[in-house]
Amino acid sequence: MTKKKITKIVGYINDDIIDKYNLYEYKNRPIVQSLDLYVHIEKHIKDFKSVDSFNYTISNINEIIREPMFVYYEKDRKSLLYYKKLLDNVCVVVKLKLRENKDSYIASVYPVSEYKIQKMIEKSYLKD
């Protein structure tokens, strides 16, 4: 008997991001979070200011996806990096998948500095 992966839908790529990065094929496709996420972010837990900050960030992934401060597209990695200020400045990495039965998913979550966010914003202007 194969185990079914436990997931929940945490959001969708908004139209502004779809238009900015020409990601029309991802329109109306869900972004999911699975229990596997905790394995991937274990190494980042100690980077958060506090346990409360980590828990708050994980509990608000859907808000980060829905109302990011800034989003950067890494075309070569097929990833969207969602940045938002919560208790920490955080980055939520969404891996984009198009194959049938494969959802785009939360690949990582970690705190970042204000400096890092500004550098990514500058980098995005250079790409445009």
Where are these predicted regions, by residue range?
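Ribonuclease/tRNase effector modules and their secretory precursors
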Residues: 1-128
